[in-house]
Amino acid sequence: MKINAALAKEKNCPLVIEEIEIDEPKDDEVLIRIVASGICHTDAESIKGNGTPFPAVLGHEGSGIIERVGSNVTHLTVGDHVVLSYSYCNSCSQCLTGHHNLCMRTIELNFGGKLQDQTYRLHKDGQNYSTFFGQSSFATYAVANKHNVVKVDHDVDLRLLGPLGCGIQTGSGTVMNSLKPEPGSSIAIYGAGAVGLSAVMAANILGLKNIIVVDIHENRLELAKELGATHTLNSQNLNVVEEVKKITDGGVHYAIETTGVPVVIKNGIDSLRVAGKISIVGMGGDVTLNFTNDILMEGKTIVGTIQGDSTPQLHIPKIIQYYKEGKFPFDKLLKFYDFNDINQAFEDSKTGLTIKPVVIIGS
């Protein structure tokens, strides 16, 4: 079947929309007509060469409508509205204990370029194209394993929902599934991008007393207030650690670091109170710590969190319900782009002009 896809042909090059071939879905797979796809930092990192092998079709925050189902797929049917999330095997020790985000085959299934049976689905002129996160949603159609797919209600605009598959799931899930803060506790969120602002909305739902957001962009800090932040700090103008400790009388109970910037990670750790806990979400470099002084003597906990410790089939419907109730207005983070403008969408995300770009691919 011929489809149009945004092709990543080599490192650090713009995506090119061209016609390619997609195979029919196999027994455990479905064919989805893509309506829209969010653009995530991980897509941008892959263009730099830090992801799946080239040539590839990227995109891992897809939403669309099922057009065909494999013979082993019983919980999905033609016409279902779906969100596509990360790929997992559902049979390893991590998956069987509910930790699908820590699947033992995570790297292979999401970044290896092949689907679960270790074959390709995308081709052009006799050359195989890598699949990304088991979906490759920067295309008019995608073939994905049934475990990638989350069925959603028909009464919410599909164009909104793709980003729930990664960035928004990561931010909200880190609060709700990983840190699980108590009502009345405090949290500092470093970085007011899509992940950080999703964490703000989740913290607000859970009834935290102090929700402190740190960023360098005033417009994003203003949006953070609108979404539920009780305090915002511009780290270009303030000693963040001192300010957080003033606000909370000694430090926050919890923190989330979304930027990956080493100095910001250190600030996040230092802003914790005794026995505080920080979740590291952003991809970054080395951080120098004195574990005796920074961690041991104050009983602090550092945890790495992937995909918000979320099982997509459980977490995404919950977030959609909060959206319907007006408690999680994630649509305020989104800006829509035509599929042909996908490279501009990447640029606007890089410069900070857009928090969460979404490319409209179909209808």
Language model features with spans:
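C-terminal hydrophobic helical "lid"/dimerization subdomain
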Residues: M1, L238, P262, K266-D270, ...
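NAD(P)H dinucleotide-binding glycine-rich loop of Rossmann-like/cofactor-binding domains
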Residues: I22, S93-Y190
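Glycine-rich beta-strand-centered segment in the early N-terminal region that forms part
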Residues: D23-S37, I47-L96, N101, V150-V156
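Short glycine-centered segments of the SAM/dcSAM-binding site in methyltransferase folds
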Residues: H81, S186, G276-K277, T301
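Adenosine-nucleotide cofactor-binding segment
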Residues: I189-A192, L197, M201-N267
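Residues in the short beta-alpha loop(s) of Rossmann-like NAD(P)-binding domains
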Residues: H217, G284, G308
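Rossmann-fold dehydrogenase core element
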Residues: K277-S279, N290-K332
